């Protein structure tokens, strides 16, 4: 894919800059970040943000068929903490930030205890959560978030019930 190609070329460029000019960097790969102030509408909206918006507007949650697409979701607090740790390390490393748990999109929708509507499959839909792998001499340091998606969604729903 163009995305994978670009990512590969950018990594290659960073490695060359490090070799030629002693350039310092930390590369961090994010996986489905969610949390307060996430984007809830539009092309850049997150899955969790879209579901929150649909829930708040009392609309059915839309899940792209077949719903078995799996993803790893990482809370923004975990993401920021690990970014800070990587910045402090200052070691020209590659990091992947995710959660150990993977959920299908349908499982996530069901966490909201709301009506679900299945929509047509999309071209180019990714069906599995793919953790980044680099095929050069560089190994990705996998970091896992501590905050759990189920707890976040449960807290979101409880806080909305208090508003009523």
Predicted regions and their residues:
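Conserved beta-loop-beta element that borders a ligand/cofactor-binding pocket
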Residues: 11-37, 62, 116
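Conserved Rossmann-fold NAD(P)-dependent oxidoreductase catalytic core, especially the SDR/UDP-sugar
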Residues: 1-2, 26
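A short, amphipathic alpha-helix embedded in the catalytic core of nucleotide-handling enzymes
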Residues: 17, 51, 82-86
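C-terminal substrate-binding subdomain of Rossmann-fold SDR/epimerase-dehydratase oxidoreductases
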Residues: 56-164
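Activation loop
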Residues: 43, 47, 51, 132-133
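Glycine-rich "substrate-gating" loop/helix at the edge of Rossmann-like oxidoreductase active sites
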Residues: 3, 31-45, 65-76
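Active-site helix of classical SDR
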Residues: 6-9
